From Swiss-Prot:
Pathway: Amino-acid biosynthesis; L-arginine biosynthesis; N(2)-acetyl-L-ornithine from L-glutamate: step 2/4. The keyword tRNA processing does not apply. This is Acetylglutamate kinase. It catalyses: N-acetyl-L-glutamate + ATP = N-acetyl-L-glutamyl 5-phosphate + ADP. InterPro entries: AceGlu_kinase-like_sf, AcgluKinase_fam, ArgB, Asp/Glu/Uridylate_kinase, Glu/AcGlu_kinase, NAGK-C. It is found in: Cytoplasm. It comes from Methanosphaerula palustris (strain ATCC BAA-1556 / DSM 19958 / E1-9c). Substrate binds at G60, G61, R82, N186.
Length: 289
């Protein structure tokens, strides 16, 4: 395709998306390669330049695990769920807020835009409660496990995000929330992104991760478009499994509450974000009502 054809294909999408809000979740695994992350941030800055308001929500699971090991603390998982004691929470805050969040804001500045790093604590953006005991299966037996300082979001106050967006900043949100007693809690970034998208009445919820999208049972084909009902059936049948389940469930939650569409994109490939948004066929999976 000629360069001018690429630009002309993008034009109607640019016109359609101008003035809309996109919430983009940067997956922890998709951020391991610094060059790939820089490319993703350049794409995000481009979106802001053409009139799209972007809120970034980032994860950081792999970096938290690496930091814990470097500090001599072995991460604890039960049934695939991280146990977060007080020391682990402090390490998570150090990594999420002090390292990853600051790094993304610096990259935004490097690309000529203005980013502001916040966590769910700031402006009471994300209010959470401590998760109840979780039922997990261990060696064919079920146990009830206390995950520690892990929360589930019960309320979102988007005022701080609206203020930043109205002043043309790109908010960068770390997945730490606060409870009613002002205690910090670690939260799932996919869930945070979904709930923020709903609170902002976002047009799109986008997940940049390390897979190409929702795949079939044989893992040979990527579904380009799916309806919510289809994703529910695929979860029940096991086609959507493991780490993809919370991503898709978060998107279904958002779509059921007014978000226009949701996208799962491989963030490890440069400019996939732009190709998904501004070409007819896209490169990932779009989920819609």
């Amino acid at each position: 395709m000629k360069r001018e054809d690429v630009l002309m294909e993008a034009l109607p999408y640019i016109q359609q998306f101008h003035g809309q809000i996109f919430v983009i979740k940067l997956g922890g695994h998709a951020m391991v390669d610094q060059l790939v992350l820089e490319a993703a941030i350049r794409d995000v800055v481009l979106l802001s330049y053409i009139g799209i308001s972007v809120v970034l929500v980032h994860g950081g699971g792999p970096e938290i695990t690496d930091k814990m090991k470097a500090m001599g603390k072995e991460p604890k998982f039960v049934g695939g769920l991280r146990i977060t004691d007080q020391e682990t929470l402090e390490i998570a805050q150090m990594v999420l807020v002090g390292k990853i969040n600051d790094g993304i804001v610096s990259l935004i500045a490097k690309c000529g835009a203005r980013g502001v790093g916040i966590s769910g604590n700031d402006g009471s953006l994300l209010i959470a409660k401590r998760k109840e005991l979780q039922v997990v299966t261990i060696e064919d037996r079920t146990e009830r496990v206390d995950l520690g300082h892990v929360g589930e979001i019960v309320e979102v106050d988007p005022a701080i995000l609206q203020m930043l967006l109205s002043n043309e900043y790109i908010p960068v949100v770390a997945p730490i929330a606060i409870d009613r007693e002002s205690n910090s809690l670690n939260i799932n970034a996919d869930t945070a992104a979904a709930k923020i998208a709903v609170a902002l009445h976002a047009a799109k919820l986008i997940n940049l991760t390390d897979v190409d999208g929702v795949m079939d049972a044989e893992r040979t084909h990527v579904y380009r478009r799916l309806k919510v009902d289809e994703t529910n059936e695929m979860i029940n049948s096991g086609v959507i499994s493991e780490g993809m389940i919370p991503k898709v469930e978060g998107m279904v939650y958002a779509l059921d509450r007014g978000v226009g569409s949701a996208h799962i994109i491989n963030g490890n490939t440069e400019h996939n974000l732009l190709l998904e948004l501004f070409t007819r066929d896209g490169v990932g999976t779009m989920i819609h009502p």
